[in-house]
Amino acid sequence: MIRRGDVYLADLSPVQGSEQGGVRPVVIIQNDTGNKYSPTVIVAAITGRINKAKIPTHVEIEKKKYKLDKDSVILLEQIRTLDKKRLKEKLTYLSDDKMKEVDNALMISLGLNAVAH
């Protein structure tokens, strides 16, 4: 089953303009109820181009810890809804602490403020 925090290879083509494309890693950011019942999934693109400008919507992930080909950056300003058929292979999953970083960067990307419970 696809779960929030899983990292998959996905085919993001075709693209336009500055969108991330090709077959590349993505992290699942959709909630697990949606992951279970929906034919689509919400993801954030991951790039291995670590020299990209570090901005508050970027979260770094280490290749050794997450069994990736290279140190990478999750681009929370590059979120997309994909058909699950675009997901190819599960690579790894992110730790709870790393997902907290993802959540924070996602809130910044979407202009959301933290809500007190």
Curated annotation (Swiss-Prot):
Keywords recorded for this protein, A-Z: Endonuclease, Hydrolase, Nuclease, RNA-binding, Toxin-antitoxin system
Gene Ontology terms, MF aspect: DNA binding; RNA binding; RNA endonuclease activity
UniProt key word Oxidoreductase: no
Pfam families: PemK_toxin
Lineage top rank: taxon: Bacteria
Top EC class for this record: hydrolase
EC id: 3.1.-.-
A GO BP annotation: mRNA catabolic process
Protein role: Toxic component of a type II toxin-antitoxin (TA) system. Ribosome-independent, sequence-specific endoribonuclease that cleaves mRNA, thus inhibiting protein synthesis and inducing bacterial stasis. It cuts between the first and nucleotides of 5'-UACAU-3' in single-stranded RNA. Neutralized by coexpression with cognate antitoxin MazE.
PANTHER family: ENDORIBONUCLEASE MAZF, ENDORIBONUCLEASE MAZF-RELATED
Record text on subunit structure and interactions: Forms a complex with MazE which is no longer active as an endoribonuclease.
Family to which this protein belongs: Belongs to the PemK/MazF family.
Identification of the protein by name: Endoribonuclease MazF
UniProt source species: Staphylococcus aureus (strain bovine RF122 / ET3-1)
